[in-house]
Each structure stands twice: as structure tokens, then as C-alpha cells.
Amino acid sequence: MILEANIEIVHRLYQTGKGSFKEMLFQLMALYEAVYTPVRIVVFGAPQNNEEYCERFSQIRNVIAERFGNTAPTVSYVAQPPCPQGLVMEVHEVVLTDADRICYKTLDDVPYITVEREGCKRLFMSGIIGNVLQATIRRQADDVFRTISHIMIAEQMPVSSIVRQWNYIEKITDCDVTGHQHYQDFNDARSLFYQSAQWLDGYPAATGIGTQWGGVMIDIDALFCQDKTVCVKAVDNPLQVSAHAYSQNVLLGEKDEKLNKKTTPKFERAK
């Protein structure tokens, strides 16, 4: 829960009918007119395999870059077919004030956006992926978290400033030939990434979303307010066991060799 009016995020949804991928993509661009400042565009579609996923993700990035130029929002492509068939686009806009300064940056060939005012900084990352075509889910997760770490270090923001995290995982409940479940491998990579941070205000609010293709992809919102003008609180559900308190009995697959046991999903229900 964020108790500050000027960090509002507005969500907008658009959908096309069925057509060629290029036609649907241009239809989405024609439908969208920004009201505030877009910081993230997420496109949901149905590629047939990872090769097509990578090709289409590149097309999406190029079209959005042409549309927005140097002020392009961050971009994600989720391989999950909308119903009915077509493309769906979700846009996140931020409501800026006169005190806010927005910057469009790139590190390790990854575009990201910061919104900063005196004493407070926000960070938006989207579409952070690894080697979708060749690497294992675990290797991809490690690479994605390494990229996130590089950006957060460059921006002087602690890992604990992540407030919202979308985790997209290909065939999330599948196991590989060694018995490692995709989701458990991701959770172990996340636990190792989080272990250096102090989570005094709880873990990020997050969701693990299974996809048909696309390996591991992460979107992140981070918020770091040194002036304490923004209060961030974890929201729990007393009717549920917190995900980070799950027992070993509900965790599937083999444990990581770097760990003594399988690690729990590190997230809060909301924040």
C-alpha cells in the first residue's frame, strides 16, 4: 500500500481482433493515446515456439521505439494467448508532478526508466530476459537477476526497494530431465538474489505467471524514498499461509546444489 497521491500508476487495456501479427501490433498502437506518461507496455500474444517469441518480441520493441522515440516506455512480451485470439496490450502510465524528473536510460542493452524527485526515486524495468533459446530455466533466472542487480547498483537503489515484481516463467510447473521444477528453480534463484538484502518492510508483492514460451522474464517496480515521505507496507491475508512460510511438503522438484533445502517463494500478497 503506497500512501502518496503523486505516485499513482494508471493501467489501461487494449485488444485487437485476429489478424497477422504485424496488423494486430499496428492496431494496438493506433488504439493507444497517452493520457499521462507511459512507463511500461506489456503485449500478450500466442507465438508458436521460442524462435517466434524472440522474433516477435524484437518486432514489438522496434514498433514501440519508432512510435515513442527517445521517450519509449519499457516493453514486455508475454507468451500467453488472449481469449479470443488476437493481441492484448496493457499500458502502465505514471502521473507526474512538477517536482518529478523522468529519465530514460540503458544498461547492459536493457532500457529502463527512473522517476526522481528530491529524496525519492522510482525505477521501472520490463522484459528482462536471459538466453531464451539455449539456457535452462535456472540459468536464465540467474542471468535475469544479475541484470536487475547491475541496474539497481547503478541507480544506487537497494534490492529491498523492489515493491512489485512480475515473474513470467515458461511451463512453470514442468520439470526438466533431472527432476528440477521450473518454478522451484526460479524460486531458488530468487532466494539467492534476495539473501543479501534486509527486508524490513516485507518482500516485494509479486506473482508467478506460467507462460507457453519465453523462458524467464521479469518486470519490476522499485521505490526508494530516503526522505520517508512515502510509506510502503506489506499486505497479508490472514486466511492464507504466507508464501515465504510454505513448508517443504508443498515445494516440488529437486533442491539447488548451492542450498541446504528447497526455498520458498519470496513475496507478499500485496504491497
Residue ranges of each PLM-predicted region?
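N-terminal presequence-like segments and the immediate start of the first folded domain
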Residues: 1-166, 171-271
